């Protein structure tokens, strides 16, 4: 039996590690969830994701309630108060229970002397909630994004930035990819209906289904047998442009966790696929995905800037480069991105993308296809990146995705759509 732990203090410490130490929630959360009961796993996730999604608001409210910020060893208490405020604002947890559990969290973080302070701030918010929220709704913090990112979105999308921000602040839809080697999408939707769930087919991507209500994977018909994979619709869009064929040699570069590797093999089961990623730890998930789906690919650890180290002089018929990026298109799915990224990261990422593109291009056969993709919405990583590549690469030609002046196709996040994603299809002359 799992030891009873204070979830509020665990959530506070996790959020502190993200914001103060730059750690990814996807690395922090799973080990924490192993320490709590199954019924508490979902609540711990909700508290962590929710606080990170609304961090600007919670920070603003605390600053209004306290004369000076908490620093040093008391900083965890700041995040514990955030967890308390989030529960009062956004959950159905009875206020008395939210307060009691949050105040008790002070003992778990070894700050029992601050129980009174935590209780006082939360009760003050309850008394002044209406006035505080009215004032908050006129502040810049209401957009729940860091100012540097807000400025970039406003510059890139003067007409659409608010809808992008609103989409980023919502809970993401759950998209699935139906394995066409097992069932047609319509057949699987009928199985889903029999299981008491409802799904909606994507209009453009032939394998994509959006669940009406997110569900645990073990409840999905045939998940363990490889009939279905959790993958956002926009990520599935890569196959529309890559169009892999049986018998071809195909490179999936920056492949982890393997969603696109396995999609290539569903579309072209007899393709010879090489999946490469720089992160050896994340490559284990590529193996896991291949195993669950009963597929085979050559999996290698390697740096995209130095392809000769892992593929020699080999050339490929098609290359999918899902480039390392700011991930500003998937904020609704990973709200910690807002607080992990910095403005200075963008030119550094653009430089890295440029180096990988230049290094991998010679490994594409003449007449071959390279699809450049990112889960970013920032032009520096997307249209401007491809525009510069076309200008310096004489044998590269843009195909089907945009114009040389405005290259690529940009998806923006939407409530019933996929994540923010960019694609450019390039042909080697």
Curated annotation (Swiss-Prot):
Keywords, comma-separated and alphabetical: Cytoplasm, Methyltransferase, RNA-binding, rRNA processing, S-adenosyl-L-methionine, Transferase
UniProt-listed Enzyme Commission number(s): 2.1.1.176
Localization terms from the record: Cytoplasm
Listed PROSITE patterns: NOL1_NOP2_SUN, SAM_MT_RSMB_NOP
Organism encoding this protein: Escherichia coli O157:H7
Entry's Gene Ontology BP terms: regulation of DNA-templated transcription; rRNA base methylation
Task performed by this protein: Specifically methylates the cytosine at position 967 (m5C967) of 16S rRNA.
Catalytic activity: cytidine(967) in 16S rRNA + S-adenosyl-L-methionine = 5-methylcytidine(967) in 16S rRNA + S-adenosyl-L-homocysteine + H(+)
Chief site of localization: cytoplasm
Gene: rsmB
Name used for this protein in its record: Ribosomal RNA small subunit methyltransferase B
